[in-house]
C-alpha cells in the first residue's frame, strides 16, 4: 500500500560467553542468525563480541565515561530490543567473560533493564543448565525478563555429533529447538513492547 512502512525489525543482541575459537556456543549464535535470516521475518541477530572488554574496574570510569571498548559494548546493548545469551558452563556456573559483560552493562545507567532475553547453552555434563540458572539469577537484579520455555541446553559431547570441528551446529533437531526458542523470544519481546505477536508462542 502506498505510504505504508514495513514494521521495524526486532533486533537481538547475541552474546557468547566463550572466547574460544571453534566454540559451540558461538556456533549457536551463528545458527540463530541463519535461522532468523531464513525463516523468522522481522527478527535480526546482531552478534556482540566481548573479548576486548577489560575486567570490571570502576576506577576506569572517568568523568562519567567508560573505556572505548566498554562504551561500544554498552551502545550495542542499548540498541537491542532483546537479548540472546549463549553460555558455556564453567565449574557449575557462568563463564568469567559473560559475567564481566553483564557487570559492565549494569553500571549506571543499567543497559539491560526491561527487555526480554533467552539463554541457550552447549556444554559437557548437564549441558550448561546450572550456568543458565545462574544467569537467570543475575538477571533478576538487572531487570532482564527471560522467557521460561523452551529451555535449550545441549550436552555437546554426547553422541550423535552435534557440532563440527569449527563449532558449527549440524544437528537438525537442535536447529528446530533453537528456532522454537527464537520464536518464543520474538513473541515475548513484542508483548513487552506492547505490540501484537501473531504466533502460537505469544500465549
Curated annotation (Swiss-Prot):
GO CC aspect terms: cytosol
What is this enzyme's class at the first EC digit? oxidoreductase
Q: Which UniProt keywords apply?
A: Flavoprotein, FMN, NAD, NADP, Oxidoreductase
The record ties this protein, via InterPro entries, to: Flavoprotein-like_sf, FMN_Rdtase-like_dom, NAD(P)H-dep_reductase
Q: Does the keyword RNA-binding apply?
A: no
Cofactor dependency: FMN
Q: Which reaction does it catalyse?
A: a quinone + NADH + H(+) = a quinol + NAD(+); a quinone + NADPH + H(+) = a quinol + NADP(+)
Endpoints of the signal sequence: none
Query: Which molecular-function annotations from GO does this UniProt entry contain?
Result: FMN binding; NADH:ubiquinone reductase (non-electrogenic) activity; NADPH dehydrogenase (quinone) activity
* Top-rank lineage group of the source organism: Eukaryota
List its EC numbers.
1.6.5.2
Tell whether NAD is among the UniProt keywords. Answer: yes
Summarize the subunit comment: Homotetramer.
**Entry similarity comment:** Belongs to the SsuE family.
State what this protein does.
Answer: The enzyme apparently serves as a quinone reductase in connection with conjugation reactions of hydroquinones involved in detoxification pathways.
- What is this protein identified as? Probable NADPH:quinone oxidoreductase 2
Amino acid at each position: 500500500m502506498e505510504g505504508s512502512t514495513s514494521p521495524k525489525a526486532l533486533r537481538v543482541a547475541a552474546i557468547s560467553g566463550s572466547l574460544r575459537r571453534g566454540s559451540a556456543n558461538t556456533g549457536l549464535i551463528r545458527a540463530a542468525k541463519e535461522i532468523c535470516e531464513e525463516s523468522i521475518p522481522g527478527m535480526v541477530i546482531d552478534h556482540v563480541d566481548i573479548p576486548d572488554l577489560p575486567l570490571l574496574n570502576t576506577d576506569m570510569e572517568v568523568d562519567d565515561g567508560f573505556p572505548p571498548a566498554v562504551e561500544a559494548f554498552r551502545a550495542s546493548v542499548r540498541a537491542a530490543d532483546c537479548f540472546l545469551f549463549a553460555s558455556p558452563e564453567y565449574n557449575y556456573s557462568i563463564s568469567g567473560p559473560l559475567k564481566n559483560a553483564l557487570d559492565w552493562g549494569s553500571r549506571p545507567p543499567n543497559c539491560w533493564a526491561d527487555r526480554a532475553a533467552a539463554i541457550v547453552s552447549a556444554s559437557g555434563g548437564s549441558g550448561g543448565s546450572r550456568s543458565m540458572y545462574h544467569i537467570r539469577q543475575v538477571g533478576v537484579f538487572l531487570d532482564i525478563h527471560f522467557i521460561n520455555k523452551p529451555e535449550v541446553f545441549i550436552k555437546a559431547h554426547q553422541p550423535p555429533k552435534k557440532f563440527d570441528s569449527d563449532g558449527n551446529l549440524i544437528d537438525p533437531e537442535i536447529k528446530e529447538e533453537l528456532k522454537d526458542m527464537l520464536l518464543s523470544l520474538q513473541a515475548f519481546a513484542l508483548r513487552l513492547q506492547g505490540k501484537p505477536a501473531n504466533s502460537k508462542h505469544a500465549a
